[in-house]
């Protein structure tokens, strides 16, 4: 799965949860706090991604996510382990 596909899914999740986020290829490297994504928002996004893709994030890795690029990379890694 490509970066833009995962980012699109994150955008869909954010929109469905009424998060007011401006997510695109330009903002993917901005710190989460600059995007106004707090820990509860991130938890909600992560749970939705886990359900959508049938993956499970490691809690320690989640604690180290600094931006959406980190999240997308982790999704890609988990999907690769799953053979997707």
Curated annotation (Swiss-Prot):
Residue numbers bearing the O-(pantetheine 4'-phosphoryl)serine modification: 39
Post-translational modification: 4'-phosphopantetheine is transferred from CoA to a specific serine of the apo-ACP-like protein.
One GO CC term, this protein: cytosol
Pathway: Lipid metabolism; fatty acid biosynthesis
One term of GO molecular function: acyl binding
Superkingdom in the source lineage: Bacteria
Claim: Lipid biosynthesis is one of the keywords in the record: yes
Keywords: Fatty acid biosynthesis, Fatty acid metabolism, Lipid biosynthesis, Lipid metabolism, Phosphopantetheine, Phosphoprotein
Keyword Phosphoprotein in annotation: yes
GO biological process, one term: lipid A biosynthetic process
SUPFAM superfamilies per record: ACP-like (SSF47336)
PROSITE patterns: CARRIER
Pfam family of the protein (one): PP-binding
Domain Carrier: 4-79
Function summary: Carrier of the growing fatty acid chain in fatty acid biosynthesis.
Identification of the protein by name: Acyl carrier protein homolog
């Amino acid at each position: 799965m490509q970066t833009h596909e995962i980012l699109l899914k994150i955008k869909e999740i954010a929109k469905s949860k009424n998060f007011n986020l401006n997510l695109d290829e330009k903002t993917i490297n901005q710190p989460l706090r600059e995007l106004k994504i707090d820990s509860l928002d991130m938890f909600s996004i992560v749970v939705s991604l886990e359900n959508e893709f049938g993956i499970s994030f490691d809690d320690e890795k989640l604690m180290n996510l600094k931006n959406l690029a980190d999240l997308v990379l982790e999704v890609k890694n988990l999907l690769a382990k799953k053979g997707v």
